[in-house]
C-alpha cells in the first residue's frame, strides 16, 4: 500500500494498491494560495491536509516515505508529519528534480523555508532526478553542505523502460522486494 498525492483517477491500480486524494490548493496570480474547491480558510485547509497525511502514514506504517520536491510539503504541511514518521523509524527521502531555478533563487527560497534545517533533522537521503554531467545540482544548490544526508543523482526517468519488482532475497515481496529497471519490452 502507498499514499499518493495527485490525481490517479482513471488509472487501473493493481491489487493491494490504493490512493488518497488530498483537498487541493490553487495558486493565485499574486503567488499566494487558496483552497481550490473547499470553502474554508487556507490555514484550515493546510491543517486538514497535514492531518490526513499523518493519519494515512500512521495507518500504512511505511518503511520508506519519498517527499516530492518540497522538503516541508506545500505550505509546510509536513512539519508535524516528518518528525513523527522519523520517530517511528520511517526512512525519509527527498526526491528533487535537477533544475529548479537559478542557484541564487533556490538558496533564497530554501533559506526562507528553512529547508536545510528540516532536511538535517528528518531526512535520510536526497535523490536527484537528473545527471550531474548535465547539471551539477549538488554543488549549485549547496546540497554538499548537508553532511549527514546521502545525496545521490539517480538519473532521468525513461518512460520507455519498464519497471519490474524483483526480490533481492529470492523470496516474496514481503521479505525484501526492490524495484529494478528492465530493458525488456
Specify the residue positions occupied by each region the protein language model found.
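Conserved nucleotide-sugar phosphate-binding/catalytic loop shared by glycosyltransferases and other
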Residues: 2-44, 48-50, 55
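Short, well-ordered alpha-helix to beta-strand connector turns
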Residues: 16-17, 62, 89, 122-124, ...
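Short N-terminal targeting/anchoring amphipathic segment
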Residues: 54-75
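Structural motif
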Residues: 66, 93-95, 127
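Short Gly/Thr/Asp-enriched flexible loops that form oxyanion-binding sites at enzyme active sites
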Residues: 75-85
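Active-site proximal beta-strand in glycosyltransferases
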Residues: 83-99
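A nucleotide-sugar donor-handling region in carbohydrate enzymes
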Residues: 97-185
Amino acid at each position: 500500500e502507498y499514499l499518493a498525492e495527485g490525481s490517479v483517477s482513471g488509472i487501473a491500480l493493481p491489487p493491494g494498491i490504493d490512493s488518497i486524494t488530498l483537498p487541493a490548493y490553487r495558486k493565485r496570480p499574486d503567488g499566494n494560495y487558496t483552497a481550490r474547491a473547499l470553502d474554508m480558510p487556507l490555514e484550515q485547509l493546510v491543517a486538514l491536509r497535514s492531518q490526513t497525511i499523518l493519519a494515512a502514514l500512521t495507518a500504512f506504517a511505511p518503511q520508506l516515505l519519498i517527499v516530492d520536491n518540497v522538503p516541508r510539503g506545500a505550505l509546510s504541511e509536513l512539519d508535524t508529519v516528518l518528525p513523527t514518521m522519523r520517530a517511528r523509524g520511517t526512512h525519509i527521502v527527498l526526491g528533487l528534480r535537477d533544475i529548479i531555478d537559478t542557484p541564487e533563487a533556490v538558496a533564497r527560497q530554501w533559506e526562507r523555508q528553512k529547508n536545510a534545517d528540516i532536511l538535517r533533522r528528518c531526512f535520510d537521503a536526497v535523490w536527484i532526478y537528473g545527471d550531474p554531467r548535465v547539471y551539477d545540482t549538488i554543488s549549485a544548490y549547496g546540497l554538499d553542505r548537508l553532511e549527514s544526508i546521502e545525496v545521490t543523482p539517480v538519473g532521468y526517468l525513461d518512460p520507455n523502460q519498464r519497471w519490474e519488482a524483483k526480490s533481492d532475497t529470492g523470496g516474496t515481496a514481503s521479505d525484501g522486494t526492490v524495484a529494478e529497471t528492465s530493458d525488456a519490452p
